């Protein structure tokens, strides 16, 4: 899943020489929390709502409302923005981008064209969450089983073959080695199109095939934790 399919393509920017007041208005009008800062069509910084709050708190301690409004028109964005902004190319995968955000402790980044270098979008935590919801299939409801299985060829197929025999249609299959011993993996299978009687029989069979961690039936918000 590439960034270019999930980013916001409408990019609202400000100039380094613009005032803090201008940035506040742009964020409110466009319902954004991050503005790329440009100078001569080149990205020179990032301004976030956090930067604005920090600047307002430090510079407006003892000012009345009129002095504060005047101050907001005088403070330049170049003085409060974060310089040397982190960016990602539009052909980055969503999971790579999530790693960049975590590593740098930021909530979003400008997205660039890898050939031209110009800004083509913005990707934020919210966009990554949307991608995660789509990837897992949780928006489709259904049933999710979580297993701990042997890490060997065919171990996932054995489970999915049984699920298909009971009429289940796979919505998503995810796998992880996080927190597992050598030779073991966790697998999360989301399915739909299975009736409740078949589900009960399927559950018993799967328990005999692998270590089950939990089952969530979103149709009735029924949750079973096995381990």
Residue locations for each model-derived region?
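Conserved short beta-strand edge segments in small beta-sheet-based binding/regulatory domains
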Residues: 171-174, 203-223
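Basic, Lys/Arg-rich alpha-helical nucleic-acid-recognition elements, primarily the DNA-binding modules
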Residues: 1-52, 56-61
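Short, ordered loop/turn segments at secondary-structure junctions
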Residues: 40, 114, 175-178, 218
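Short acidic/polar active-site loop segments enriched in Thr and Asp
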Residues: 33, 107, 169
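Short proline/glycine- and acidic-rich turn/helix-capping motifs at secondary-structure junctions
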Residues: 177-185, 216-227
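Tandem CBS (Bateman) regulatory domains
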Residues: 1-10, 49-86, 93, 98-102, ...
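Short basic, glycine-rich beta-strand/loop surfaces that mediate nucleic-acid
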Residues: 184-195
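A glycine-centered beta-loop-beta connector
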Residues: 27, 35-51, 101, 109-126
């Amino acid at each position: 899943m590439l960034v270019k399919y999930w980013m916001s393509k409408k990019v609202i920017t400000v100039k380094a020489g613009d005032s803090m007041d201008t940035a506040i208005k742009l964020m409110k009008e466009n319902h954004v929390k991050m503005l790329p800062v440009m100078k001569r069509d080149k990205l020179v910084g990032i301004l976030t709502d956090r930067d604005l709050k920090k600047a307002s708190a430090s510079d407006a301690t003892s000012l009345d409302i009129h002095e504060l409004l005047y101050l907001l028109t005088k403070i330049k964005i170049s003085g409060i923005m974060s310089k040397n902004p982190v960016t990602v190319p539009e052909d980055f995968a969503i999971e790579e981008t999530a790693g960049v955000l975590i590593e740098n402790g930021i909530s979003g980044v400008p997205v660039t064209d890898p050939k031209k270098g110009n800004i083509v979008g913005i990707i934020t935590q919210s966009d990554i969450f949307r991608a995660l919801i789509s990837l897992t299939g949780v928006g489709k409801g259904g049933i999710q089983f979580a297993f701990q299985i042997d890490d060997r060829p065919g171990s996932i197929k054995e489970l999915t073959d049984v699920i298909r025999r009971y009429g289940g249609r796979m919505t998503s299959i995810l796998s992880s080695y996080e927190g597992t011993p050598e030779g073991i993996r966790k697998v999360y299978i989301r399915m739909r199109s299975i009736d409740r009687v078949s589900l009960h029989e399927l559950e018993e069979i799967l328990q005999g095939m692998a270590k089950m961690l939990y089952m969530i039936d979103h149709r009735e918000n029924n949750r079973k934790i096995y381990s």
